[in-house]
Amino acid sequence: MLLGTLSLNVPSYELNQDNLFDYLDSKKYLAANFIQITEIDSKERIITGSIKANRSGKFKIEYQEPLKEIISSDGKYLYRLDSELEQLDIIPHEDDFLNTPISILTLEMRDLKKLFLIDSCQTQQEETICTILPRSEDSFLEKLFLIFEQNSLTSIKYMDSFDQTVNLKLNDINWFPFDDSEITLSIPEGIDVVYH
């Protein structure tokens, strides 16, 4: 989730603690490709993929290499399609799901402000790093960083309760509206469906 970004940037003012939620609120849709780097116990795993999300709670994440997995949500259920296992898991949305990094892109602003607080935004040269903390002590998410270059979002990095550090480097970012059909999961024939 880094490099060449298509910008609908914050106007020519500097991102800071006071205007970050306004910036996020102005972004109703996101489409991007990404490279996800997960670090745990000094080991690194790299996965490529794409993401589409909107503020109505809907999203679709397609992992391409080395995983072949799709995770999507229609705002009511979370769907996890594992092509290798030929299995679709359907999980109802629960409150625990709200404290995950995808919430930054899918929740309405009033809900986002209830769940998270902006700890700081620090700018060095052309990079701004905003630190976001969950309000709940029971959150899976410990700390989240939004990284901007010249006011364009380039990376989402977080640390979780499993001692993992995950960095989503965004590229080919597009903030333009898209149809819900683009994030609807189509279920291949012969897939086992598991309800949780």
Residue ranges and their predicted role:
Residues S50-T100, V166-N167:
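An acidic-aromatic
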Residues A32-F34, F59-Y63, L78-L81, I132, ...:
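Short hydrophobic/aromatic-rich beta-strand segments that constitute the beta-sheet cores
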Residues N16-N19, D25-G75:
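N-terminal mature ectodomain segment of secretory-pathway/periplasmic proteins
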Residues G49, L78-R80, L88-D89, F97-N99, ...:
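Short, charged/polar low-complexity linear motifs in solvent-exposed/disordered segments
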Residues D111-H196:
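Gly/Pro-enriched, hydrophobic low-complexity segments
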Residues L2-P11:
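Hydrophobic h-region of N-terminal signal peptides that target proteins for export
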Residues Y13-T38, E44, D82-E142:
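Flexible, processing/modification-adjacent segments and terminal tails
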